[in-house]
Amino acid sequence: MAVNPLLTPTGQQTIPLIPSPFGPPTVDRDVLPSTVAPTDPRQFCVPSQFGSSVLPNTNMANVLSSRIYPGWGILPPESIKAVARRNEMIQRHHTARTEMEMYAIYQQRRMEKINPKGLAGLGIPFLYGSSVPAAPAAYHGRSMLPAGDLHFHRSTLRNLQGNPMLAATAPHFEESWGQRCRRLRKNTGNQKALDSDAESSKSQAEEKILGQTHAVPYEEDHYAKDPDIEAPSNQKSSETNEKPTTALANTCGELEPTHRKPWGSHTTTLKAKAWDDGKEEASEQIFATCDEKNGVCPPVPRPSLPGTHALVTIGGNLSLDEDIQKWTVDDVHSFIRSLPGCSDYAQVFKDHAIDGETLPLLTEEHLRGTMGLKLGPALKIQSQVSQHVGSMFYKKTLSFPIRQAFDQPADTSPLLDPNSWSDTMNIFCPQDTIIPKGIERGSMRN
């Protein structure tokens, strides 16, 4: 029979034993009732600061709930460093989520300030994708976009500006853009100018577009000094009207503004100087017979950019008008050999049997790792091929949106005003994609 250690044997003086302060208190099995005492002699000791010791038995639910505090268990306690690291990670997640929500609210307020209907009123297709209709009805009449649609990564805008394949592959971009712009212009009419913040951002956007314009200075001055293209008296500023119009026209292949000076039946020759020596001159017919019904000429391909002179004529058998996918291995060899600084690697392309179908698929890793090219020639070849492919897609998709571009009469409002977009924005430029001013401001601030 077990003896209580707190009691002495019969006949001796009872002296209570003081438990050690350094060890956990224990409870004898005979002190507890039979319903509580477990069959296993092992005991589960709890330090005194968490209550008296109890035993792990299935019949002790009430005892455990009143004696043991949350967080106490049989597992070893977690280290302080791990707890601090976990708390810091959770705090970072909460902070990042809060910043994203605040930025979304800020973007919404700014879009509402520029356009009361929000971006859904503009109906920009690439915000939602080709599968979702670009209309406010898609969101059941809500006047603003969800918070997730306001986060545009900067690389997305760069790809839209620099890679024409993203927007040229789907004709839905040109169709819905032109229809929504014309509808927006009819509904809004003559609206008041925006506040000073919007005007300052407009001037910044004008300077950026003018800086990117690859125009001949003489033609730009000629458009500015022509008395027939004076801004109407009801416009707020002639400078705000003239410069963006000229910049957009010159950027999109030296195309004159459709709403300022109707063209007659004539042809014009543009002379482009070669980039390397400045002596060669290649003349192109850029305007054909104009449409006498509405006095508008169809737009023409842009002149070659600096550095693309090798794409104009290569050995007399390759030109910009030819499809790059039809090139043979010898054509690719001639193309690489004609590029300045890349003639030494032309034989490498021929040894690897690179033709017109595989040339656009080459990446920098292929050129440098597999074919052994240096960084400069590899980047130059990639740039020339991308410009060639972009001009090819541009010419293929040019004829389709132009028929809708001139269905409506032209407007005399500024091109950069989001309340009255001009029809000339239907003309798709591969290198200079026009985007709304609100998104442009967001990308410039980022």
UniProtKB/Swiss-Prot annotation:
GO terms for biological process: negative regulation of DNA-templated transcription; negative regulation of gene expression, epigenetic; retinal rod cell development. Monomer, homodimer and homooligomer. Component of a Polycomb group (PcG) multiprotein PRC1-like complex. Interacts with PHC2, NR2E3 and SAMD11. Interacts with RNF1 in a PHC2-dependent manner. It holds the Pfam family SAM_1. One of its GO terms (cellular component) is nucleus. This is Sterile alpha motif domain-containing protein 7. The keyword Nucleotide-binding does not apply. Residues 327-392 form the SAM domain. It is linked to Macular dystrophy with or without cone dysfunction: A form of macular dystrophy, a retinal disease in which various forms of deposits, pigmentary changes, and atrophic lesions are observed in the macula lutea. MDCD is a progressive, autosomal recessive form characterized by reduced visual acuity and macular atrophy involving the fovea. Some patients also exhibit mild generalized cone dysfunction. Keywords: Cytoplasm, Nucleus. The keyword Ribosomal protein does not apply.
